[in-house]
Amino acid sequence: MPGKHVSRVRALYRRILLLHRALPPDLKALGDQYVKDEFRRHKTVGPGEAQRFLKEWETYAAVLWQQAEDSRQSSTGKACFGTSLPEEKLNDFRDEQIGQLQELMQEATKPNRQFSITESTKPQL
């Protein structure tokens, strides 16, 4: 069973990094780093928390895939990524998670992001 779990985690991790290729370069860099940190941080959690972790990241991957598809099919060529977080979900977060979320939001909405990556903004799915 542990081998199956490890391969599921790795496949999800790779899928998310592939999906991030559809993001603008600065958001891709931010997202990639966040995913790497979160997966590393959750390496040693218990089975219950691991299942919740995987479920949330699988949902994220599905939403990101749909947004990337919508972006590719859009006639305007303008990509729209992200979603609102319902208040009831926020109420389930621990204080540490709220802090992480706030830091991520601030970083993602900075006018001059710290990442200066120059590559094509065309999605590579």
Swiss-Prot record:
Q: Which Pfam families match?
A: Complex1_LYR_2
A biological process from GO: mitochondrial respiratory chain complex II assembly
Would you tell me the Gene Ontology cellular component terms?
mitochondrial intermembrane space; mitochondrial matrix
Which family is this sequence assigned to?
A: Belongs to the complex I LYR family. SDHAF3 subfamily.
Query: Per its UniProt entry, which superkingdom is the organism in?
Result: Eukaryota
| Protein purpose | Plays an essential role in the assembly of succinate dehydrogenase (SDH), an enzyme complex (also referred to as respiratory complex II) that is a component of both the tricarboxylic acid (TCA) cycle and the mitochondrial electron transport chain, and which couples the oxidation of succinate to fumarate with the reduction of ubiquinone (coenzyme Q) to ubiquinol. Promotes maturation of the iron-sulfur protein subunit Sdhb of the SDH catalytic dimer, protecting it from the deleterious effects of oxidants. May act together with SDHAF1.
Transit peptide span? 1-30
What is the name of the protein in this document? Succinate dehydrogenase assembly factor 3, mitochondrial
Which keywords does this Swiss-Prot/TrEMBL entry list?
A: Chaperone, Mitochondrion, Transit peptide
Q: How the protein assembles, per its UniProt entry?
A: Interacts with Sdhb within an Sdha-Sdhb subcomplex.
- Give the subcellular location: Mitochondrion matrix
* UniProt-listed InterPro entries: SDHAF3/Sdh7
